[in-house]
């Protein structure tokens, strides 16, 4: 082992001394992709490491004892100058095997004043010991073992007194402040919780893993004048034995995991819905200033409808899950998680729950609806049936994300089935295209940090996409039957993926839904091919239009190289249709392929376009031979465009952008295909285009091709913007309004005169005459007024932010204030972000700071100057200094800027301030360097198209007939993208890369040694 370390260290030293040439930088997944994403998204940092040879994690609790019941008293001192919580927990537990002499549970950041183990009334002498590195409390018997009986468990009780200061980091039991109305001078404090994934151990000693389910009886002691809420209905309330307090006792919970508990102590008001007996079944609670202004009405209506719809869909009524359950939706002023599915007490940021018809735009309206749906779906997928461990978190979050869209679509007309394509399928295909992407089922997750990393785009978005693919494989009714059986069989238990697979397979077999796929089709292996291995395939389709023979080669897609060297085969459901008889309605697969090369008979001969993956139900990309691409382009530019499903047009846009980025296709070819956007007016293709163009435009800043590309985008968007116009029309469909909300800011960024002038005029109408800007136009109107204005415009909007009572409007303002380039105004904003002054909330620091950097192209330098002048103040505001610095690194535009930034990082004072974060922060600058170098490899191809325009493609005609595919086929030659030659690095850059190499080498050593 020592010899290996010495050898590697010697190699590393040799690299530094010799300044050996660095291989061309081919990494094209860049830092800013971690920063681009909507609310409630979990954007991967592409830093997950595939784990193998997994051993039991030292962070996992032993299963030698298990709890059955907790009795908890929480004492919440939210009204005191020093805010604390304390209490007592009595855990009923038993041994699961003989010769157990130690009980191991979780406890962290608490003072324990008493730890007593009893069997009945007999005290068992023990020695408690803390093991803080694993958050463990070890209670060792001084003599003998716990009694064990396999047939009749011998019960013990472990009683622990605890106390802790109220947290302020939005984990465990923490404090939050609010004003009933913005001009209220009286700041009010409340206590609330966030336990997922590993923070229940901050609130009380417990078995803080999802697999240790138990029942809970809870009493909350609170100050007089406050109210409390818990997961279940209140059993009773009365004076405490301690003066100035009252105690609320709650009914027993269902059998549940610790991370799903929650409590609130506040002076909130409720908007209730009761049954005939007057019992509250569903309520929304929030600060009185929001409830009294009607901001809870929308969530109350939609929440009840979603709960009823999900109860019907699952065949398992929510209120039948346990007689003590009710549904409370709570708006929390400070809430880092966004929303949380605590069983019966769901918690949300205000912006994700409270709706005001005059001041909440369509974006936040749909967020409120679909986050309600996500959390309500968890009552079944996550709460009733829980992932056995966080390595299969997709069993919880994949289904919640799936129903976030489709459950909402059954209740509200918000275009969510369409938007699933852009927001879930396309987003997860990108995250999953890195060689570092983790599989959905990811053994080896142990530490709290590793658990946190599982809350990723792959887990949420890919999980939901694979579930959708499987639903189309089985059919909706069969899929629902299988899910109902899964929930029924595993209610109040934990689940592994095989439990889901067998339930769905059984339903499929009983209904005959799997017979069409042949006797060799193994449903479990199909599902495992998508959950147990990372990545996804690109299908390379070559069509002989004279014979109808289609040769399909699958390769794992790699965003950096096109085809991954880590090739894998997936079991892929295939659908396709042709121009001979186009049909995009039947999404049931016609073929299942699992081999590297497969031949399929198209069924017709002749020059007909062919499109695979109908409605993009499958989780894969499709690349065609050049001739077939030409036929598709002709169709998209002509009358056949309307025959091709909107989702498939969006699929083509997204695929083509990623093929060009990875080198599977030139940008000249890609833009030829994308030229059909000139005639496109639908939502999904244009949102896919916006995403692709924004990514490319960010990399072309300072390049001559940027202005030419901008002109082309304006040209192509003239038809859709001509139909939409810049102002909403009364009664228009939601998706038209939402497309305008997406496109209008882009038009202003492209300096379209109608947009810039319109924004200025609308803003002045607000500032001078008080006429409100239409809610769906405020994002682009505010931003462009600030870009074109100065201190006057900034002060007007900042005062509006400070005084507004609707949090969704405050967020829109916070997201646009950074558009100012006025230095003093920008510095005012930055100071209020990083100074604890109850002006901007900690949960919004990252949003506000990122907007300050990215809201205006000139701001990167201004914000970096501010950071350098206020280093400690900025670093203190964030959990990690990497957060604010990553925003700077992502927007450096030239090699000179990167080198200047790296030189600053390498100063002794900055390295000392960054500490252990230095390596990651320096690595961010290297990622940006790679981005700059990558652009040089595509400039010629881009320029060729922008200069010459579209290729001329001549249509051809032929007759239709059927033909059988040949019985054998020669595997086609796959053209690999060439590795581009990048500019040589400067000495400074070479030293930087050498340093990064050593950092990476150290990480590898840590893993393998």
UniProtKB/Swiss-Prot annotation:
Disulfide bonds: none
GO CC term (a single one): side of membrane
Bound cofactor: record note: Binds 1 zinc ion per subunit.
GO biological process, one term: proteolysis
UniProt EC number: 3.4.11.-
Known cofactor(s): Zn(2+)
Region of interest (Disordered), residue spans: 955-980
Site (Transition state stabilizer): 460
Active site: 375 (proton acceptor)
Propeptide boundaries: 16-52, 988-1009
Molecular functions (GO terms): metalloaminopeptidase activity; peptide binding; zinc ion binding
UniProt-annotated location(s): Cell membrane
Membrane topology: Lipid-anchor; GPI-anchor
Alphabetically ordered keywords of this record: Aminopeptidase, Cell membrane, Glycoprotein, GPI-anchor, Hydrolase, Lipoprotein, Membrane, Metal-binding, Metalloprotease, Protease, Signal, Zinc
Main location: membrane
Function noted in UniProt: Binds to the B.thuringiensis toxin, CryIA(C).
UniProt family annotation: Belongs to the peptidase M1 family.
Protein name (database record): Membrane alanyl aminopeptidase
């Amino acid at each position: 082992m020592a010899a290996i370390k010495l050898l590697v260290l010697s190699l590393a030293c040799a690299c530094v001394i010799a300044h050996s040439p660095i291989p061309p930088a081919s990494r094209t997944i860049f830092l800013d992709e971690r920063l681009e994403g909507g609310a409630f998204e979990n954007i991967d940092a592409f830093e997950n490491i595939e784990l193998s040879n997994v051993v039991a994690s030292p962070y996992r609790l032993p299963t030698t004892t298990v709890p059955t019941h907790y009795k908890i008293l929480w004492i919440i001192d939210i009204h005191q100058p020093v805010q604390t919580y304390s209490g007592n927990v009595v855990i009923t537990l038993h041994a699961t095997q003989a010769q157990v002499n130690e009980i191991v549970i979780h406890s962290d950041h608490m003072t324990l004043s008493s730890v007593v183990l009893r069997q009945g009334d007999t005290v068992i002498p023990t020695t408690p010991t803390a093991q803080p590195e694993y958050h463990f409390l070890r209670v060792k018997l001084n003599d003998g073992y716990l009694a064990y009986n396999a047939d009749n468990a011998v019960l013990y009780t472990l009683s622990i007194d605890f106390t802790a200061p109220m947290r302020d980091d939005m984990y465990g039991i923490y404090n939050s402040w609010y004003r009933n109305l913005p001009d209220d001078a009286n700041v009010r404090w409340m206590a609330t919780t966030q336990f997922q994934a590993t923070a229940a151990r901050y609130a009380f000693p417990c078995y803080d893993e999802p697999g240790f389910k138990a029942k809970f009886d809870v009493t909350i002691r609170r100050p007089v004048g406050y109210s409390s809420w818990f997961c279940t209905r209140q059993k009773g309330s009365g004076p405490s034995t301690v003066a100035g307090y009252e105690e609320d006792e709650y009914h027993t919970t269902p059998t549940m995991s610790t991370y799903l508990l929650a409590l609130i102590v506040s002076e909130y008001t409720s908007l209730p819905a009761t049954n005939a007996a007057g019992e509250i079944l569903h309520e929304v609670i929030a600060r009185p200033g929001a409830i009294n202004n009607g901001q809870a009405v929308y969530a109350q209506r939609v929440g009840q409808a979603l709960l009823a719809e999900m109860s019907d869909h699952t065949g398992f009524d929510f209120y039948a899950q346990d007689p003590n359950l009710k549904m409370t939706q709570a708006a929390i002023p400070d809430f880092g998680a966004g929303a949380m599915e605590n069983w019966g007490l769901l918690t949300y940021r205000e912006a994700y729950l409270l709706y005001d018809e005059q001041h909440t735009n369509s974006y936040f309206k749909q967020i409120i609806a679909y986050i309600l749906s996500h959390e309500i779906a968890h009552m079944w997928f996550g709460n009733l049936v829980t992932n056995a461990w966080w390595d299969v978190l997709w069993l919880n979050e994949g289904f919640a994300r799936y129903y976030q869209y489709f459950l909402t679509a059954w209740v509200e007309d918000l275009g969510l089935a369409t938007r699933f394509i852009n927001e879930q399928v396309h987003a997860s295909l990108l995250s999953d295209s890195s060689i570092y992407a983790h599989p959905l089922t990811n053994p080896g997750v142990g530490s709290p940090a590793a658990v946190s990393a599982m809350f990723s785009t792959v887990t949420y978005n890919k999980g939901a996409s694979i579930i959708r693919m499987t639903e189309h494989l089985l059919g909706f009714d069969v899929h629902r039957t299988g899910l109902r059986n899964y929930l029924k069989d595993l209610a109040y238990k934990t689940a592994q993926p095989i439990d889901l697979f067998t339930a769905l397979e059984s339903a499929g077999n009983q209904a005959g839904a799997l017979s069409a796929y042949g006797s060799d089709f193994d449903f479990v292996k199909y599902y495992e091919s998508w959950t147990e291995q990372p990545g996804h395939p690109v299908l390379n389709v070559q069509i002989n239009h004279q014979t109808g023979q289609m040769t399909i080669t699958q390769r794992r897609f790699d965003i950096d190289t096109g085809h991954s060297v880590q090739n894998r085969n997936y079991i892929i459901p295939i659908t396709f249709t042709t121009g001979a008889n186009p049909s995009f309605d039947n999404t049931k697969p016609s073929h299942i392929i699992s081999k590297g090369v497969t031949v399929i008979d198209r069924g017709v001969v002749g020059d007909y376009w062919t499109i695979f993956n109908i409605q993009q139900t499958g989780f894969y990309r499709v690349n065609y031979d050049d001739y077939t691409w030409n036929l598709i382009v002709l169709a998209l530019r002509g009358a056949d465009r309307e025959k091709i499903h909107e989702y498939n047009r969006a699929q083509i846009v997204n695929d083509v952008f990623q093929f060009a980025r990875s080198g599977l296709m030139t940008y000249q070819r890609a833009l030829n295909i994308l030229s059909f956007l000139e005639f496109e007016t639908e939502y999904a293709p244009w949102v896919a285009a916006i995403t692709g163009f924004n990514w490319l435009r960010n990399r072309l800043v300072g390049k001559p091709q940027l202005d030419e590309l901008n002109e082309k985008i304006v040209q192509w968007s003239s038809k859709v913007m001509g139909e939409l116009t810049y102002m909403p029309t009364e009664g228009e469909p939601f998706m038209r309004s939402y497309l305008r909300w997406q496109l209008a800011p882009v038009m202003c960024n492209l300096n379209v005169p109608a947009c810039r002038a319109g924004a200025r005029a609308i803003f002045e109408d607000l500032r001078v005459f008080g006429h409100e800007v239409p809610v769906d136009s405020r994002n682009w109107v505010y931003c462009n007024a600030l870009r074109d204005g100065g201190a006057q415009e900034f002060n007007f909007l900042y005062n509006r932010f400070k005084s507004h009572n609707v949090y969704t409007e405050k967020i829109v303002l916070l997201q646009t204030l950074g558009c100012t380039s006025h230095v003093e105004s920008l510095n005012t904003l930055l100071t209020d972000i990083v100074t604890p002054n109850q002006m901007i909330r900690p949960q919004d620091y990252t949003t506000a700071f990122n907007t300050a950097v990215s809201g205006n192209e000139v701001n990167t330098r201004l914000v970096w100057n501010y950071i350098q002048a206020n280093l400690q103040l900025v670093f203190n505001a964030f959990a990690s200094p990497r957060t604010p610095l990553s925003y700077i690194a992502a927007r450096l535009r030239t090699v000179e800027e990167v080198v200047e930034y790296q030189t600053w990082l390498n100063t002794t004072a900055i390295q000392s301030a960054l500490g252990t974060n230095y390596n990651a922060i320096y690595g961010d600058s290297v990622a940006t360097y790679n981005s700059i170098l990558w652009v040089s490899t595509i400039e010629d191809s881009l320029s060729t198209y922008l200069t010459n325009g579209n290729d001329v493609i001549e249509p051809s005609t032929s007759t239709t007939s059927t033909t059988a595919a040949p019985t054998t086929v020669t595997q086609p030659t796959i053209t690999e993208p060439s590795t581009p030659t990048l500019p040589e690095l400067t000495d400074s850059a070479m030293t930087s890369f050498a340093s990064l190499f050593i950092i990476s080498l150290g990480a590898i050593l840590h893993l393998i040694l």
